[in-house]
Amino acid sequence: MTKKYLNTQNEISAFWNTQKIFKKSIDNRKGQESFVFYDGPPTANGLPHAGHVLGRVIKDLVARLKTMQGFYVERKAGWDTHGLPVELEVEKKIGIKGKQDIEKYGIENFINECKKSVFNYEKEWRDFSKDLGYWVDMDSPYITLENNYIESVWNILSTFHKKGLLYKGHKVTPYCTHDQTALSSHEVAQGYKNVKDLSAVVKFQLTNSKDTYFLSWTTTPWTLPANVALAINKDLNYSKIRVENEYYILATDLINSIITEKYEIIDTFSGSNLINLKYIPPFESDGLVNAYYVVDGEFVTNSEGTGIVHIAPAHGEDDYQLVLERDLDFLNVITREGVYNDRFPELVGNKAKNSDIEIIKLLSKKQLLYKKQKYEHNYPHCWRCGNPLIYYAMEGWFIKTTNFKNEIINNNNNIEWFPSHIKEGRMGNFLENMVDWNIGRNRYWGTPLNVWICNDCNHEYAPSSIKDLQNNSINKIDEDIELHRPYVDNITLSCPKCNGKMSRVEEVIDVWFDSGSMPFAQHHYPFDNQKIFNQHFPADFIAEGVDQTRGWFYSLLVISTILKGKSSYKRALSLGHILDSNGKKMSKSKGNVINPTELINKYGADSLRWALISDSAPWNNKRFSENIVAQTKSKFIDTLDNIYKFYNMYNKIDHYNPNNEITKSRNTLDNWALSRLNTLIKESNIYVNNYDFTSAARLINEYTNTISNWYIGDSRGRFWEQGISNDKKDAYNTLYEILTTLSRLVAPFVPFISEKIHYNLTGKSVHLQDYPQYKESFINQALEDEMHTVIKIVELSRQARKNADLKIKQPLSKMVIKPNSQLNLSFLPNYYSIIKDELNIKNIELTDNINDYITYELKLNFSSVGPKLGNKTKNIQTLIDSLSEYDKKSLIESNNFKSLSSDAELTKDDFIIKTLPKDSYQLSEDNDCVILLDKNLSPELIREGHARELIRLIQQLRKKKNLPINQRIDIYIGVTGELLESIKTNKNMFKENFVIKNIHLNVIDEYENTIHFNNKEIKISLLY
């Protein structure tokens, strides 16, 4: 049966599917050492975007690489299914808004809609992953909404509760009034924005002192109605000052930063003198007994503000702790909806966070506003809905993460981070400021918090499993009960302390606890798969966006540290953001979003993958555009494909079967290409093993272009020659080795084209092969160094041709090469044939003396010699101008510039020296050598140049007519004058470049094609 060749991405995907290549790639490594990979779960109720591409590319690259390196790498997909984003999507779909509407709609109905919503785009995610070439098991994923998963999460929470680590507390927490739920510290860290808010310096009148005021600066005027105290620092100095007819008290060091008018200092004293002084609040609230006086607060500083802080315990953690310590009254004037309640009748019903202007107007009306101004600061916003958060005192459920702070930090220090600065930077800094994890959410669609509280004695119980729930339930519970609201809400347990009824708390848990539990819950641990869990914990590698230092990276680390004493991952790669071409964040509203599926359809997945990997390190933010993908396709993917097509084109003619074991060739180019290949393997392996995929990709890119531009170009004649000579066999064997090895080397990066090349050449899937290891015996560093020099000389010469406007098709009679004194070019004659072919040069002269070909221009560097010579500078320049050519050369070559002046010691740096070619030569030079090309064109050279250019044009016609290169043809040319002579003189050159029966000159009247050459028309027909 004839082997079917793979050509398109769809054909390759179909081949992988029908031949189960993904499964085979894993099964082939069974019994080998495992490399454990965790796939961070996306949510399937939104479409994949450009940021998802980078994450999936890196994960796939690592998994494929480690598999080819011999590891057993299982790849289990996951779905993150709970949380507020799902609720908001459902609200929008069914036309409701807010918690009250949800309650009216019915929690059960709402939960059912959420379950449907989470897999709205599962097909798009599957197609996207398949099209990208992302190999992951999506047929048996872990799903956070499934009972087995939730049961494992419950088991973790139950363990924490039994150890006293899960507790109910009253704390000031970040709170979203739009979503009406608290946020954890790591969620808050994801949503900071730079904003300008109104700040105010407020006057607090001292009791029994009509004209004396404390001045307090606040950036949250909307919290003033909740004021219960003023805080000072007893160790700071404060002053009483007079401004016109009023007296103000504030920190001495801050007077000049606050007071703009003329003032007089009346008295200066310690802050301790102010403690217990009473004041009249700007918005007094009835019913408070222990409030409205000055207290000491260690957190008060003289770095900004007035040194006096207004205390609102409902809206600040420091404020709340101070109130607890001093037994002050607590005042809350804001509802959970974020509006003022009737404790603040002036603005009852107004959105508090939006009321700064109204508050300032009220202060002004009461003559209690000293001044107001805009204040720019970093303010937390909800990472889900974008609304500004408030700090709000409320009851909540917390995990005592601070008890494990040192262990968590130590475990983080043992993680290998990419980039390394994340460890002590973004991640380390966040861990240093860790607070207890606020885990409860007053929402609906999530893992229910598994805590039941006795209605009679307040005893708490946290069941660890469904069986535990059944054993303690008052009513019978079905085996298949769904562990979601409202079903678990209806379960009552029997209190083990007093036999009373226990009811579940209303909260669901933070979705980050869901995803952070995946190392355990994906295996239904500890109920099942304990051995499998032990084999898959911890992960060797994870990768997600940099934001996940406050999300998944954090939750994984914290949960596993508390539960198992160690991190759940050994290595973490933190991915940068994908930005638009102007460095702006992509968003639908800006219209700058790139659709990855469209890019894949247009340019292929490999182009997109390679563009993301080779552009810059994956942890860098990337400016990205369609143009970058298009250029990548052109510069790398197409180049690699064209090398394969070149090999395939000639091999279809010769039907040569290359040796499986490559041996040393007799050809210098072959040995150089194979040496470079093995050096590439050696160096790129070092990079990929250190997760530096970008550096590896750049090396591969450079090598591929070198093979295309040099090896293919210089070996074309070897493949073209008739028959199968030993030299031709060497060329085939070498290029076959390059293609099959290179395809294995790039397979983790670009899985489609690597499969096409390797399978079509060998009949075997590249993804079932081992990753290449270098062969020391093939590395010849001296040969590589010599060819590197040859390439530099050729490139320098090409630049000279370009500067002289001499096309490469035009042969030149001679080039002269002069190395500098440090460069040894004694080896160069061995490469003359290569240089001649590359540059279309007849003769090469290697010399240490080019005096016959150049002149020197010598001028003073006036900025250097001016200070040395003063008014004698002009005399020295006159002397230089009078020197003969011979004297100039002698002076420069001897470096004896001191002889020019007895007044100052002159050196080479005091002169501007230019090397100029004589009229008939073109010069090009670098630090290593000087190149001179003879521009004189004899009639014979001109005719040969015309013939070569005409051959190029005929080759284009042949390709246009889709004539195979081995198709025997008759060439009919209608031409006169000098061009006719060019063809006649160089007829053999045509026979060397085409398989022709004959060349016929001016023998027919009508021709198929007309081409223009040197402003003349040439008629051509190709017949076969």
Curated annotation (Swiss-Prot):
PROSITE patterns: AA_TRNA_LIGASE_I
Motif 'KMSKS' region, residue numbers: 585-589
Leader peptide range in chain numbering: none
Cellular localization per UniProt: Cytoplasm
Motif ('HIGH' region): 42-52
EC number annotated for this UniProt entry: 6.1.1.5
Keywords: Aminoacyl-tRNA synthetase, Antibiotic resistance, ATP-binding, Cytoplasm, Ligase, Metal-binding, Nucleotide-binding, Plasmid, Protein biosynthesis, Zinc
Binding positions (ATP): 588
Short name of one Pfam family: Anticodon_1
Enzyme class: ligase
Domain comment in the entry: IleRS has two distinct active sites: one for aminoacylation and one for editing. The misactivated valine is translocated from the active site to the editing site, which sterically excludes the correctly activated isoleucine. The single editing site contains two valyl binding pockets, one specific for each substrate (Val-AMP or Val-tRNA(Ile)).
Reported function: Catalyzes the attachment of isoleucine to tRNA(Ile). As IleRS can inadvertently accommodate and process structurally similar amino acids such as valine, to avoid such errors it has two additional distinct tRNA(Ile)-dependent editing activities. One activity is designated as 'pretransfer' editing and involves the hydrolysis of activated Val-AMP. The other activity is designated 'posttransfer' editing and involves deacylation of mischarged Val-tRNA(Ile).
Family: Belongs to the class-I aminoacyl-tRNA synthetase family. IleS type 2 subfamily.
Record note on quaternary structure: Monomer.
Name of the protein in its database record: Isoleucine--tRNA ligase
Annotated source species: Staphylococcus aureus
